[in-house]
Amino acid sequence: MKLLFMYLLPLLYIAPILLAVAFLTLIERKILGYMQHRKGPNVVGPFGLLQPIADGVKLFIKEPIRPSTSSQLLFILAPTLALALAMIMWTPFPLPIPYSNLNLSILFILAISSLTVYTILGSGWASNSKYALIGALRAVAQTISYEVTLALIILCSVLLAGGFTLSAFAISQEFTWFILPLWPMFLMWFVSTLAETNRAPFDLTEGESELVSGFNVEYAGGPFALFFLAEYANILMMNTLSTIIFLGSCMSSLTLTTSLLMTKASILSLCFLWVRASYPRFRYDQLMHLVWKNFLPLTLALVILYVSMPISLLFTPPLPWKRA
């Protein structure tokens, strides 16, 4: 029985994430529909609730077409690896108990998220299509650029939390959320997560007018669905990480902790979708100008400020107080 549970545990961990990803796509289509004064999916099942299941079945029963000039092994390996990395990133998350409690969990998440670059680059190169390759190179440059600011913001929050574990963030935010002292960091973090997950207005990799569909232009059926699942799993993961780092969590009971974490992450995910419905796509030079000439100097200045403030106040006497 214990052996069976050991094999079933990863499945029990992955299944709810995939289910959440499926319904996130439905919520996105519904929100975009209502923002454009239309209904969105409303045919399959009650209120269109079974639309993601129908889409998944449709994609996986389609014939997997592979270009004859493509690198066959890498072409199939790239989407599989993308989804595998997206699932691995969830292991240190306290939901409320982590599947794998790591000492350096925040660095582990950052390292695995940077590995997703190789899946995008691999898919673009293996497709043997100029559109896919240009889209992949854009995605790689964009992801690497915005990871610099993400790492600096994480460094600053780690200095305040006093540890690299995600549970340390929950404990240190018991009285005050980090979003209050770090609100400029949070705004830059939110924009950087949009760019990191290749979402609008930073979806330069999928510029229809110039790149058809981006790095996954040659994919259809099952492999395309794997890329789709990986993208939305990364969106949910980034929003959950934003919640843990900046919006704290309740430590009173496990059920309340999970409910509040899910609610805050859902609200941030809705903000992602709202941004997509509201803003046009950036030009590529504007995208790079934003990170290298605006975000990077500002995050460096704020990191120096947050590091130097405690040191500068180290030898000052404590504030006088009177006994009541």
From Swiss-Prot:
One of its GO terms (cellular component) is mitochondrial inner membrane. The keyword Acyltransferase does not apply. Keywords: Electron transport, Membrane, Mitochondrion, Mitochondrion inner membrane, NAD, Respiratory chain, Translocase, Transmembrane, Transmembrane helix, Transport, Ubiquinone. PROSITE patterns: COMPLEX1_ND1_1 (PS00667), COMPLEX1_ND1_2 (PS00668). Its main location: mitochondrion. It catalyses: a ubiquinone + NADH + 5 H(+)(in) = a ubiquinol + NAD(+) + 4 H(+)(out). One of its GO terms (molecular function) is NADH dehydrogenase (ubiquinone) activity. It is a multi-pass membrane protein. It is found in: Mitochondrion inner membrane. The chain crosses the membrane at residues 3-23, 73-93, 106-126, 151-171, 175-195, 226-246, 255-275, 295-315. Its EC number is 7.1.1.2. The keyword Glycoprotein does not apply. Core subunit of the mitochondrial membrane respiratory chain NADH dehydrogenase (Complex I) that is believed to belong to the minimal assembly required for catalysis. Complex I functions in the transfer of electrons from NADH to the respiratory chain. The immediate electron acceptor for the enzyme is believed to be ubiquinone. Belongs to the complex I subunit 1 family. This is NADH-ubiquinone oxidoreductase chain 1. The lineage of its organism: Eukaryota, Metazoa, Chordata, Craniata, Vertebrata.
